[in-house]
Design a protein with these regions (language model features):
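Non-catalytic DNA-recognition/assembly elements of restriction-modification systems
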Residues: 1-17, 136, 140-199
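A short beta-sheet element
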Residues: 55, 59-109
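A short glycine-rich beta-alpha junction/loop motif
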Residues: 81-87, 122-148
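Periplasmic-binding protein-like
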Residues: 113-117
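DNA target-recognition patches
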Residues: 7-46, 84
Length: 199
């Protein structure tokens, strides 16, 4: 297995949407769980300079690494363009036959890389990270078949975790409903005053 720097396999991408009237429902953000979310919390008065994130491309906010202690990054897994504010950095994988985009995203999502990103933030007020520092990071590069195996195992684990979380959520709903039923059947009695006889 060899190591490569991100600069060898990724490149910046810059495409402005050109639409000055995007709404919060058109614009995406990236959360700490490294997922796109809509609607965005807010948009500017003129959104024509908002950036396009095509399918399979990545968006990250390098300025929030120090604040969030994680790198807010996500990949567009849909078949439609997403739009993000100019605060985000958009990049893509260079054309190649030796790196899977799912494998790269899996590596960039890891807690180990988050610690590395946080440690290498700059000394600015926001504790951000420059593109140069980000793209100089090394990642392990196994063979393409090994990458596929890693991704398959990772996705299976994520699926199991999500299934378990859904079951826990369902169990919580059942428990909450049962507790509410008990409250209605057995309402709390009012505190009664106890009178002590004087001697």
């Amino acid at each position: 297995m060899t190591n490569i720097t991100l600069s060898e396999v990724v490149e910046l991408y810059s495409e402005r949407c050109g639409n000055p009237h995007l709404t919060v429902y058109d614009v995406s953000g990236v959360n700490r769980d490294k997922e796109f979310f809509e609607p965005s919390k807010q948009v500017g008065d003129d959104t024509s300079n908002y950036q396009v994130v095509p399918p399979h491309y990545f968006a990250c906010n390098l300025m929030h690494v120090g604040r969030d202690m994680v790198l807010p990054i996500s990949q567009n897994h849909t078949d439609k363009n997403k739009y993000v504010s100019p605060a985000y950095t958009v990049f893509r994988i260079k054309e190649n036959d030796f790196l899977l985009d799912d494998y790269l995203f899996m590596i960039l999502k890891s807690k180990e890389k988050d610690r590395y990103f946080w440690f290498h933030t700059d000394s600015s007020v926001r504790d951000g990270m420059s593109w140069e520092d980000f793209s100089s990071i090394e990642i392990p590069l196994p063979g393409i078949e090994v990458q596929r195996e890693y991704v398959a195992v990772y996705k299976a684990m994520q699926h199991n975790l999500n299934a378990m979380q859904n079951k826990l959520d369902d169990l919580k709903l059942v428990c909450d409903a049962y507790i509410e039923q008990l409250r209605q059947q057995y309402p709390p009695t009012q505190n009664r005053k106890v009178h002590h006889r004087s001697r």
